[in-house]
Amino acid sequence: MGALTKAEIAERLYEELGLNKREAKELVELFFEEIRQALEHNEQVKLSGFGNFDLRDKRQRPGRNPKTGEEIPITARRVVTFRPGQKLKARVEAYAGTKS
């Protein structure tokens, strides 16, 4: 199974909506840039019917170097999390049930 790329999304917009290829690529780039900027400004991103992107602060915690076994601290950081919405969950679960 492959991965859906931004280029493929742009190609589908070109095919489905009749945008020219440059416009389709720009639309995809602008869409993701808006999400990036919102997250950079500590805003939650809610995409109705799809899911939410949130920021979560993780505290510093102990870790271990897998090669040496040496204990090293994992520094505190902010991470982006995604929580799928109910509609997306239902569609994925319905599809997963049809695979053999």
Curated annotation (Swiss-Prot):
GO cellular component, as recorded: cytosol
GO molecular function, one term: structural constituent of chromatin
Highest classification ranks of the organism: Bacteria, Pseudomonadati, Pseudomonadota, Gammaproteobacteria, Pseudomonadales
Known partners and oligomeric status: Heterodimer of an alpha and a beta chain.
Protein name: Integration host factor subunit alpha
Residues that span the membrane, as ranges: none
Matching InterPro entries: Hist_DNA-bd, Histone-like_DNA-bd_CS, IHF-like_DNA-bd_dom_sf, IHF_alpha
Gene it is expressed from: ihfA
The organism of origin for this protein: Pseudomonas aeruginosa (strain UCBPP-PA14)
Pfam families cross-referenced by the UniProt entry: Bac_DNA_binding
SMART domains per UniProt: BHL
Chain intervals for the UniProt region annotation (Disordered): 54-73
The protein's role, per its UniProt record: This protein is one of the two subunits of integration host factor, a specific DNA-binding protein that functions in genetic recombination as well as in transcriptional and translational control.
UniProt keyword terms in alphabetical order: DNA recombination, DNA-binding, Transcription, Transcription regulation, Translation regulation
HAMAP family xrefs: IHF_alpha
Protein family per UniProt: Belongs to the bacterial histone-like protein family.
Gene Ontology biological process: DNA recombination; positive regulation of metabolic process; regulation of DNA-templated transcription; regulation of translation
NCBIfam families: himA, PRK00285.1
